[in-house]
């Protein structure tokens, strides 16, 4: 049986709980907001993690922190977000991207991971490696320094002295 674990709060939480009860769904578990240090244990208890946002122009430039947290815990992501987040997930080979608000695609993606656990584990590993490589503090600091150097238009020799 596929079980959905929904952790945290949100504007739609009570409506979703009521809808699940009305439909007699027994495979949904709701957990209240948790302390930040407890979140990785919930993520690691999952076979795949969902990041779903409404289809909106605004969200095309968003990179949900949840997505990076899930990837850092080596969990494959089912992503219903367009734009930058989707590009990152594809480059990382860390999950499956679906169209936002496409319930049929969501069902298919959940079923895929339920039936293909090894593929999910591989995507999870890919995502973790990508996050470590591309989003570590060291990597971010190096990118930031390069941008500053370009903005300051420092000659190559001067850059070497600063880095030393």
PLM-predicted stretches and their roles:
Residues 25, 43-60, 75-76:
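Acidic donor-binding loop of glycosyltransferase active sites
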Residues 44-47, 68-76, 91-92, 98:
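Conserved donor-binding/catalytic loop of nucleotide-activated donor transferases
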Residues 5-8, 13-41:
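Nucleotide-activated donor-binding/catalytic signature segment of Leloir-type glycosyltransferases, i.e.
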Residues 105, 112, 119-133, 143-146:
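A short, well-ordered alpha-helix in the C-terminal region of glycosyltransferases
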Residues 52-53, 79-81, 90, 98-99:
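Conserved acidic donor-binding loop of glycosyltransferase catalytic domains
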Residues 37-40, 64-73, 83-87:
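Short alpha-helical segment that forms part of, or immediately flanks, the ligand-binding pocket
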Residues 137-164:
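C-terminal alpha-helical cap of glycosyltransferases
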């Amino acid at each position: 049986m596929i079980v959905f674990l929904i952790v945290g709060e949100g504007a739609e939480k009570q409506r979703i709980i009521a809808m699940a009860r009305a439909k007699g769904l027994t495979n949904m578990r709701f957990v209240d907001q948790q302390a930040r240090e407890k979140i990785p244990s919930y993520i690691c208890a999952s076979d795949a993690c969902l990041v779903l946002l409404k289809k909106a122009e605004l969200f095309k430039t968003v990179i949900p922190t949840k997505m990076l947290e899930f990837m850092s815990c080596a969990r494959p992501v089912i992503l219903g977000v367009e734009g930058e987040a989707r590009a990152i997930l594809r480059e990382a080979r860390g999950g499956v991207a679906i169209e936002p608000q496409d319930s049929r695609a969501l069902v298919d993606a959940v079923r895929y991971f339920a039936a293909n656990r090894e593929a999910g584990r591989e995507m999870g590993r890919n995502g973790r490696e990508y996050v470590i490589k591309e989003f570590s503090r060291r990597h971010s600091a190096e990118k930031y320094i390069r941008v500053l150097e370009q903005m300051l238009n420092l000659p190559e020799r001067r850059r070497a002295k600063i880095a030393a």
